[in-house]
Amino acid sequence: MKEYLFTLTDKVRDYECDLQGVVYNSNYHHYMEHTRHEFLESLGENFGKMHEQGIDAFVSKVEIQFKNSLRSGDRYLSCLNVYKQGVKLVFEQDINRLPDNVLATKGTVESVIVENGRLTRGEYFDEMLKRIENK
């Protein structure tokens, strides 16, 4: 299995499924978002405190490829890796069904930092990535 910087295990809930009995497409976006937030919290990041300091992280682009559908009750492993590209922080994310590790979705999410209303060069991300390297 591919190596990841961060993983999170969760379970599909009934209300996340459509009439076909599979996870509704937008819920994969929620799964990925939740994983990113948990990852950032594990680094000590807090979006509320950042905002109070005039620093806001925004998603600038999302691309999700749907490979195999998850169903109600399925357990899954939501995984991510991260790197900086120019001013953006790029999250590469996979969701694998458990226990067989079948790839359900893969996605790329790009994020930028706006400080006091202005797009930055991503210096905040540089500091965050240094903390990851030192872990």
Language model features with spans:
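Hot-dog-fold acyl-thioester-processing enzymes
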Residues: 2-59, 114-135
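HotDog/MaoC-like acyl-thioester-processing domains
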Residues: 66, 71-72, 82-135
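Hydrophobic beta-strand-centered segment that forms part of the acyl-chain substrate-binding groove
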Residues: 39-90, 106
